[in-house]
Amino acid sequence: MITLKRLVGSSIVLAMLVILLGAYTRLTDAGLGCPDWPGCYGFLKVPEQAHHIEQAEALYPDRPVESHKAWNEMIHRYFAGTLGLLILAIFLFSLKHKRLLLPSLLLALVIFQAALGMWTVTLALHPVVVMGHLLGGFTLLSLLALYWWQLQPAPFIAVKHSLKFLFWPVLLVLAAQIALGGWTAANYAALACIQLPVCEAGWTSQLNFDEAFSLHLGYDNYEYGVMSQSARATVHVMHRVGAVITLLVVAAYAIALWRNSSGLIKTLSLTVLLLLLLQFSLGLANVVLHLPLANAVAHNFVAANLVMCLVVIGYQLHRNKESAYV
């Protein structure tokens, strides 16, 4: 059991690192730094010698080797592959403990994540795939956290009964907002509006929902986006509106939990509230500072931790039937 706990704990840390590297890869426009998968220009690592670069560019004449982008992509793949091996080890160690639901889900999800990583390249950054890959990473982190807590003794929870059931709509609101954020990033719409509080003057007359939420099938390459400016602005505006709704809903829930609980739930609810305020501030900074790299990566990372903490709260509220609900 100790070995299993250590494996899960290590996987959580590694999953966080993979999420950071994934955001960095995307934000440095390195998603196609290697135009093939799982290698890079036909090599196991980035080609660096002159004759290897010549071979690579002969194989992909439309994709000249950009070493820094290729390394960003390959480092992300190396760490993601290591995470996959750790999760396989978790599954194998879990066989003797007879708790296979979460390990099985984790193994299935990490395999699907690998497939999404491949499709990200082979489908040239299709927005649906990119968004799905991001959501899959967040889900993987949350499931790892759930499994870690499943391996711990169940704490006694005392909260109002209504707060247990309110968890699900609150989680849905947060998940929808994260999906909007992923759609914004995947369609290169983060700088479609650079004024506060909503967008540039006259934005209401430019809203284009049909194009903003179209699947945009049939393009050969989605790098840097295929949407019109009006569609990108629409996506951006909806993400801002969603941010305000999410701030109000999740903050109200976290405050209610904090006021009506103790121990672990009280600590987690305060953590959610602080992460929520930090995330909203990072979003504002992205607009005001025109998407600085470190800030944008942090915005992605805090979102992952926010959903993880909220999911853990939900798990703790539902796991112990002997807990007191009043």
Where are these regions (language model features)?
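N-terminal signal-anchor transmembrane alpha helix
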Residues: 6-38, 173-184
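Small-polar-interrupted transmembrane alpha-helices in polytopic inner-membrane proteins
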Residues: 10-21, 102-120, 169-177, 267-285
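Interfacial helix-loop-helix junctions of multi-pass membrane proteins
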Residues: 24-36, 114-134, 184-195, 232, ...
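Extracytosolic (periplasmic/ER-lumenal) interhelical loops and adjacent juxtamembrane/interface segments
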Residues: 30-73, 190-231
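Membrane-interface loop-to-helix entry segments
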Residues: 71-88, 128-140, 234-252, 296-305
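Membrane-interface helix-loop-helix junctions at transmembrane boundaries of multi-pass membrane enzymes
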Residues: 92-104, 161, 254-272
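Long, hydrophobic, well-ordered secondary-structure blocks that form the structural core
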Residues: 101-146, 150-153
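A juxtamembrane structural motif centered on a specific transmembrane helix
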Residues: 146-163, 308-326
